Amino acid sequence: MKVAISGGGTGGHVYPALALIRELKKSHPEAEFLYIGTEKGLEAGIVKREGIPFEAIEITGFKRSLSLENIKTVMRFLSGAKKSKQILRDFKPDVVIGTGGYVCGPVVYAAAKLKIPTLIHEQNSVAGLTNKFLSRYTDKVAICFEEVSDSFASEKIVFTGNPRASEVVGVDSEGALEAYGLVSGKPTVLVFGGSRGARGVNEAVEAVLPEWNNRDFQLLYVTGDVHYEKIKDSLAELNLGNHISVQPFIYDMPKILNAVTLVVSRAGATTLAELTALGVPSILIPSPYVTANHQENNARALEKNNAAIVITEAELKNTDLMATVDSILNDEAKLNSMKLSAKQMGRPDAAAKLVEAVLSIMK
């Protein structure tokens, strides 16, 4: 079996693709894979480090508003589709999968024109422009949020969830908190704003750290590499207790997620898939700097089901973050209710469901 996969730009498109590849390898160890992305995207480094064959095309994204740049993008799309056809003819895949981001546009389009079975995976509650366009040509559209179903033809939709969810379930958390100077078994809050951190989240947390010194529950505060040194210097005079650990980055996130009680974070699709698969309650601060405000829409889906509390970045200045954390951790009934609600939304079998959908369209 030969499988071509394309998706990129951000980790939210790349990591689900890699999770799918790993799941496919379990049942089809003989399978061959080819990843098609861009050299400038996050995918180039990540995929190559995984040892997966990689081919690059050149493409840029469409602007949502009218722009002369879109004319250039159309030309790049056509050129990318032409190169994709050649790559696919040489590789001869049995199926082509797109996991989002503009790079998968010409790849999946070319595959459809070559009559190769195709599937796209939409991680968010708001459909991306590329996936909206491709859905006219693909055989199946795999989704993670019911809210996005109106964007696609109902006969093509299959609800799978995000395959990254499957990779955090059952991970051994022994020693996870100790690695960061904390104690296992104590209520612990994880705060992070994505791989690079988020200034708005950091400012809100810094404002309540003096209060946190007086709390019994632990804090694992991940600032992001970019912000770490500045924040570390500003906290030097606070004499933070041993129950507060400030880190630039977390490399073993699946282990940590299995060890914490509550998460304060952005609302990226992959993060929410992981939290719900594990049944971890959350306080979500959606990034306002994303396309079509999709993070807030993602977060509201959890809020509607009592799995999270949502605070927009605009609301942060007038919201007592410490009081919000207290309202959850000091109310066992509320904490347990949010855990149960998050767990009910989770799709720990998402990777297997997505593989099932892929195999169903293969000739």
From Swiss-Prot:
<dbReference type="GO" id="GO:0030259">
    <property type="term" value="P:lipid glycosylation"/>
</dbReference>
<keyword id="KW-1003">Cell membrane</keyword>
<comment type="pathway">
    <text>Cell wall biogenesis; peptidoglycan biosynthesis.</text>
</comment>
<keyword id="KW-0132">Cell division</keyword>
<keyword id="KW-0961">Cell wall biogenesis/degradation</keyword>
<comment type="similarity">
    <text>Belongs to the glycosyltransferase 28 family. MurG subfamily.</text>
</comment>
<dbReference type="GO" id="GO:0051301">
    <property type="term" value="P:cell division"/>
</dbReference>
<comment type="function">
    <text>Cell wall formation. Catalyzes the transfer of a GlcNAc subunit on undecaprenyl-pyrophosphoryl-MurNAc-pentapeptide (lipid intermediate I) to form undecaprenyl-pyrophosphoryl-MurNAc-(pentapeptide)GlcNAc (lipid intermediate II).</text>
</comment>
<keyword id="KW-0573">Peptidoglycan synthesis</keyword>
<dbReference type="Pfam" id="PF04101">
    <property type="entry name" value="Glyco_tran_28_C"/>
</dbReference>
<protein>
    <recommendedName>
        <fullName>UDP-N-acetylglucosamine--N-acetylmuramyl-(pentapeptide) pyrophosphoryl-undecaprenol N-acetylglucosamine transferase</fullName>
        <ecNumber>2.4.1.227</ecNumber>
    </recommendedName>
</protein>
<feature type="binding site">
    <location>
        <position position="195"/>
    </location>
    <ligand>
        <name>UDP-N-acetyl-alpha-D-glucosamine</name>
    </ligand>
</feature>
<feature type="binding site">
    <location>
        <begin position="10"/>
        <end position="12"/>
    </location>
    <ligand>
        <name>UDP-N-acetyl-alpha-D-glucosamine</name>
    </ligand>
</feature>
<feature type="binding site">
    <location>
        <position position="250"/>
    </location>
    <ligand>
        <name>UDP-N-acetyl-alpha-D-glucosamine</name>
    </ligand>
</feature>
<dbReference type="GO" id="GO:0005975">
    <property type="term" value="P:carbohydrate metabolic process"/>
</dbReference>
<dbReference type="GO" id="GO:0009252">
    <property type="term" value="P:peptidoglycan biosynthetic process"/>
</dbReference>
<dbReference type="GO" id="GO:0005886">
    <property type="term" value="C:plasma membrane"/>
</dbReference>
<dbReference type="GO" id="GO:0008360">
    <property type="term" value="P:regulation of cell shape"/>
</dbReference>
<dbReference type="InterPro" id="IPR007235">
    <property type="entry name" value="Glyco_trans_28_C"/>
</dbReference>
<dbReference type="GO" id="GO:0071555">
    <property type="term" value="P:cell wall organization"/>
</dbReference>
<dbReference type="GO" id="GO:0050511">
    <property type="term" value="F:undecaprenyldiphospho-muramoylpentapeptide beta-N-acetylglucosaminyltransferase activity"/>
</dbReference>
<feature type="binding site">
    <location>
        <position position="124"/>
    </location>
    <ligand>
        <name>UDP-N-acetyl-alpha-D-glucosamine</name>
    </ligand>
</feature>
<keyword id="KW-0131">Cell cycle</keyword>
<keyword id="KW-0808">Transferase</keyword>
<dbReference type="GO" id="GO:0016757">
    <property type="term" value="F:glycosyltransferase activity"/>
</dbReference>
<dbReference type="GO" id="GO:0051991">
    <property type="term" value="F:UDP-N-acetyl-D-glucosamine:N-acetylmuramoyl-L-alanyl-D-glutamyl-meso-2,6-diaminopimelyl-D-alanyl-D-alanine-diphosphoundecaprenol 4-beta-N-acetylglucosaminlytransferase activity"/>
</dbReference>
<feature type="binding site">
    <location>
        <position position="295"/>
    </location>
    <ligand>
        <name>UDP-N-acetyl-alpha-D-glucosamine</name>
    </ligand>
</feature>
<keyword id="KW-0328">Glycosyltransferase</keyword>
<keyword id="KW-0472">Membrane</keyword>
<dbReference type="Pfam" id="PF03033">
    <property type="entry name" value="Glyco_transf_28"/>
</dbReference>
<dbReference type="InterPro" id="IPR004276">
    <property type="entry name" value="GlycoTrans_28_N"/>
</dbReference>
<dbReference type="InterPro" id="IPR006009">
    <property type="entry name" value="GlcNAc_MurG"/>
</dbReference>
<keyword id="KW-0133">Cell shape</keyword>
